[in-house]
From Swiss-Prot:
Transmembrane segments: none annotated. This is Large ribosomal subunit protein eL33. GO terms for molecular function: structural constituent of ribosome. InterPro entries: Ribosomal_eL33 (IPR001780), Ribosomal_eL33_CS (IPR018266), Ribosomal_eL33_sf (IPR038661), Transl_B-barrel_sf (IPR009000).
Amino acid sequence: MRIKGVVLSYRRSKENQHNNVMIIKPLDVNSREEASKLIGRLVLWKSPSGKILKGKIVRVHGTKGAVRARFEKGLPGQALGDYVEIV
């Protein structure tokens, strides 16, 4: 089952930004319980040039269904607001 998601932001604090950890909101997932079922699944982002960057969902973020995904390499800023595929 493949799910689409939107890249919301980098994982960050007031002074630090973790470029290889992204906050992703899967579409049609609205609770922490539903999001926890996605932990361990693969996340794919396709760049405009066709390169595919892979990540893995590592934990839930908040109570509205967002998740954190750790990528092998950090995603570029142009990925913000773009769609990813959760496999």
